[in-house]
A protein has these predicted regions:
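A conserved helix-loop-beta module that forms one wall/lid of the active-site cleft
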Residues: 194-207
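Short, acidic/turn-prone active-site loops that include or flank metal/cofactor-
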Residues: 30, 35, 94-101, 172-174, ...
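Structural signal for short hydrophobic segments within the conserved structured cores
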Residues: 26-30, 203, 455
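Active-site core segments that coordinate phosphate-bearing ligands/cofactors
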Residues: 4-6, 109-121, 132-167, 177-192, ...
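Short beta-strand-loop/turn "lid" adjacent to the catalytic site in phosphate-handling enzymes
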Residues: 62-96, 124-128, 155, 159-179, ...
């Protein structure tokens, strides 16, 4: 019997059809539009997202050799996807990368709310989290709040359209309203945010044992899916990607190479000491995902390519591969986002720098320094993460560069594995569906059977020693630059935050 998995990303919807043995039988993609009606805003039309999903699902269903017996869904997390009592959107979805609630986050940081909330939820607050968006809407669009009956995420919205039932997966709910240890809504968090009134908006919380619902007749008609098949609400995308990469037991690690570099470690305990990064339930019983999503990732490489007159990151990697191992002394600190950096330390004033330039440095040396600087953030996040992983699974568009894969192995000192599946998030949702519907007994068994490794890159130990010295330089340069980050902003430099030692 075949099955379907939906992975609804921010800019692309992906739907994959699977055979029983895990072979990908069909893949359909649909672009989705992010609108920015004002500076810092990021929204999506909820009806358009569902229409794109339904269309892609129907295309896959029509290409399968037999009718699918299950559909699993994962999607982008956070944001606010508000609906009324009839399940109709009360406005556009406010996305995870929306920045309109900066004032709310600044106030919570200043008043100590963010630090206390982290001890309960395990996640650092950001402007695109539901609490910040709700606080902004309550102040600026109270009519919309009054018309809303349920606060959903993208995955919850798609689950509602597929089943008629509003719900949220625990991983999606982990931040900002859930007590990560009790795995339930926290009244104290609502009090801290001053959002007691919003408690009524929270939908049913679905844990690992309650993921399965039945597809509605209307959704079956829209998508071409068979009536009565199970719908599985899988963990949201960063968790599903970890599962799809085979990271399902404590101590395993993965990194998603995208616009952000999300370095993730699986744990069996919750650590809420240094308020940085996020901790969410993985979707695997008894396991948590400790994630460090940086602001310094693929967009920095895009910037570097443009700076050097190149047309793509592929060209940047090719140029960097020709650079000398010592990069002619050039060093790069990659904090280029106007929002600063959020992992493995939090500082909204963080800025990048290119240092050590000389007449001996060529374009290839600068290209290599740029790539190495970005790669150092992966090591920095692993250093801040709990445990000591023995390998690192990589996924995302960056895995197409053989040079970068070898560099990551050498910088981290870990064997790097590349999953055979290009649609890792969808595979993670499918694996969740197999376990949830009893087709596989548990996640380790499911991953062992259905996650294949396409390539493994072993670290060069001599190169790792050299990069360890360079990592120490990276940390020293960062601390030396801190006073410059705030000089032009009239601020006092913050105390050095966690994120790695030598």
């Amino acid at each position: 019997m075949t099955a379907i998995a939906i992975d609804a990303g921010t800019t692309t919807i992906k739907v994959v059809g699977y055979a029983d043995d895990g072979k990908e039988l069909a893949v359909s993609r649909r672009p989705t539009q992010v609108t920015r009606p004002r500076p810092g805003w990021a929204e999506q039309d909820m009806a358009e997202v569902w229409a794109a999903v339904a269309d892609a699902v129907r295309e896959v269903v029509e290409s399968l050799p037999d009718a699918p017996g299950m559909v699993a869904v994962t999607a982008q997390g956070d944001g606010a996807w508000l609906v009324d009592g009839q399940g109709r959107p009360t406005g556009p979805a406010v996305l995870w990368n929306d920045g309109r609630a900066t004032a709310q986050i600044t106030e919570w940081e200043r008043d100590g709310v963010a630090r206390e909330a982290f001890r309960i939820s395990g996640s650092r607050l950001s402007t695109g989290m539901p609490n910040a968006v709700l606080a902004w809407l309550h102040e600026n669009d109270p009519d919309r709040v009054a018309r809303s009956s349920h606060l959903l995420t993208c995955g919850g919205w798609l689950h509602l359209k597929l089943t008629g039932e509003p719900a949220v997966d625990e991983s999606d709910a982990s931040a900002p309203f859930m007590d990560i240890r009790r795995r339930d809504w926290s009244d104290r968090l609502f009090e801290l945010y001053g959002l007691q009134w919003a408690r009524r908006l929270l939908p049913e919380l679905r844990d690992d044992d309650h993921r399965v619902t039945t597809i509605s007749a209307s959704a079956a008609a829209e998508t071409g899916l068979p009536a009565g098949i199970p719908v599985v609400l899988a963990p949201y995308d960063i968790c599903a990607t970890a599962i799809g990469a085979g990271a399902v037991t404590a101590g395993q690690a993965c990194c998603i190479l995208g616009t952000t570099l999300s370095t993730e470690v699986i744990t069996d305990t919750v650590v809420t000491d240094e308020p940085v990064g996020i901790t969410v339930t993985l979707g695997v019983p008894g396991r948590y995902l400790r994630a460090f999503p940086t602001m310094s990732g693929g967009d920095v490489l895009d910037w570097g390519a443009a700076l050097l007159g190149l047309t793509s990151v592929t060209d940047l990697m090719a140029l960097a591969a020709r650079g000398g191992r010592d990069t002619a002394g050039v060093r790069f600190i990659p904090y280029l986002s106007p929002a600063g950096e959020r992992a493995p330390f939090f500082d909204t004033t963080a800025r990048g720098s290119l240092s050590g330039l000389s007449l001996e440095a060529g374009r290839e040396d600068m290209a290599r320094a740029l790539v190495e600087g970005v790669t150092m953030t992966i090591r920095d996040c692993l250093t801040a993460a709990p445990g000591s992983p023995d390998r690192l699974a990589l996924c995302g568009g960056g895995t197409r560069s053989d040079f970068w894969m070898r560099l990551i192995a050498d910088v981290t000192g870990l064997p790097v594995t590349i999953p055979a599946s290009a649609e890792v998030g969808a595979r993670g949702a499918w694996l969740t569906g197999l376990v949830a519907t009893g087709r596989e007994p548990d996640f380790p068994t499911a991953a062992a059977r259905h996650v294949e490794v396409a390539a493994t890159y072993q670290p060069d130990l001599k190169a790792f020693d050299d990069f360890s010295d360079q990592y120490a330089d990276f940390l020293r340069l960062r601390e030396l630059n801190r006073p410059l980050w705030t000089r032009d902003r009239g601020q006092t430099p913050p105390a050095p935050a966690g994120g790695g030692g030598v």
